[in-house]
C-alpha cells in the first residue's frame, strides 16, 4: 500500500484470527487466562498503532473454535480505545439468527459498537430468516446499541473453497489437511459430510448441493486457470473429470469460490435498510 498508493482512504482492523493463531496456533481449545491476557495485549498494541477495531471471521478455522467470551475480551480492548467489533458472523445459514444474537451480545458485553459484514441468509431453506435478522438489528438499534451492517449487491457470496469442508478437518491447519487429501478414504469421508450432515456452515448444501451453482472466481491452479469464472461443474466437464475430483484439486490449489446461495428479494430487502 505504501509503495503503490490507493485512490481511497484505508483503515485497518486487527484480526481475531491472527491474534488467536499467534498465541494458540490452529488448535481447537480455549485460551488459558494467561493466554487470553496475551491475546488482549496484542489487540491493545494494534489499537495503539492505529487499528479501528477488532474483526472476526467465525466460519473459518481457527476462529471457528473461539467461544464468545474470548471474542468479547478482545472486542472490549477495542472499545477502550473507541474502536468497534467487526464480524463475519459464526453462521449465515441454518443458525443465522443465533449468530446475529451472538454478535449483538458480544457488542453489549464488550461495550463497543458492532458492524456485521455481509449480512445474508444463505441457502434457500434459510431465505425466510432475513426479515427476522433485520428485525433483531433494528431492535438493538432502537434500544440504543450501535449496530451497522453491510450487504453484498449480488446473490453469490465469496470464500476460499476449502471452507466447504467441515472445520474439524483443519485442527492441524490448512497445509496439514492439503497433505492428506490424496487419501481416497478421507475424500470420501469429506464428501459424505458435505452431502449429508448439518449443524455446521455447509456451503455446498447452501448452494443446493449443485456444482453448477458454485463459480470458481480464481483457481490458483495451473491446470484450471484458464477456466476462472466458470462453474465447478463446467470446469470438471471441460477436463473430463468427476466434479468431486475437481473440487479436491481446487482445494489443494487454494481456489476462491463464489457459491450462489442468496435470493434477489433478500438482497433488495437488505439494501433498503437504514443501517
Regions found by a protein language model. Give the residues of each.
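Divalent metal-binding pocket/active-site signature
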Residues: 45, 51-103
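N-terminal, positively charged nucleic-acid-binding surface of large information/translation enzymes
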Residues: 1-5
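Active-site neighborhoods of metal-dependent hydrolases
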Residues: 7, 13-14, 18, 22-33, ...
Amino acid at each position: 500500500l505504501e509503495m503503490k498508493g490507493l485512490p481511497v482512504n484505508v483503515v485497518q482492523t486487527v484480526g481475531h484470527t491472527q491474534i488467536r493463531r499467534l498465541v494458540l496456533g490452529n488448535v481447537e481449545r480455549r485460551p488459558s487466562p494467561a493466554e487470553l491476557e496475551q491475546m488482549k495485549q496484542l489487540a491493545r498494541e494494534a489499537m495503539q498503532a492505529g487499528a479501528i477495531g477488532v474483526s472476526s471471521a467465525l466460519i473459518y478455522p481457527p476462529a471457528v473454535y473461539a467461544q464468545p467470551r474470548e471474542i468479547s475480551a478482545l472486542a472490549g480492548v477495542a472499545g477502550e480505545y473507541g474502536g468497534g467489533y467487526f464480524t463475519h458472523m459464526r453462521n449465515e445459514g441454518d443458525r443465522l439468527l443465533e449468530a446475529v444474537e451472538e454478535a449483538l451480545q458480544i457488542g453489549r458485553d464488550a461495550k463497543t459498537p458492532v458492524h456485521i459484514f455481509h449480512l445474508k441468509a444463505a441457502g434457500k431453506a434459510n431465505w425466510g430468516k432475513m426479515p427476522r435478522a433485520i428485525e433483531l438489528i433494528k431492535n438493538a438499534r432502537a434500544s440504543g446499541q450501535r449496530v451497522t451492517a453491510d450487504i453484498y449487491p449480488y446473490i453469490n457470496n465469496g470464500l476460499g473453497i476449502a471452507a466447504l469442508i467441515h472445520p474439524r478437518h483443519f485442527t492441524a491447519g490448512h497445509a496439514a489437511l492439503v497433505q492428506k487429501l490424496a487419501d481416497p478414504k478421507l475424500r470420501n469421508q469429506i464428501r459424505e459430510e458435505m452431502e449429508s450432515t448439518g449443524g455446521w456452515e455447509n456451503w455446498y448444501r447452501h448452494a443446493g448441493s449443485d456444482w453448477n451453482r458454485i463459480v470458481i472466481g480464481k483457481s490458483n491452479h495451473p491446470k484450471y486457470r484458464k477456466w476462472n469464472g466458470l462453474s465447478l461443474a463446467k470446469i470438471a466437464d471441460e477436463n473430463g473429470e468427476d466434479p468431486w475430483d475437481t473440487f479436491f484439486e481446487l482445494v489443494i490449489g487454494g481456489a476462491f469460490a463464489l457459491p450462489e446461495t442468496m435470493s434477489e428479494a433478500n438482497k433488495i430487502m437488505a439494501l433498503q435498510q437504514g443501517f
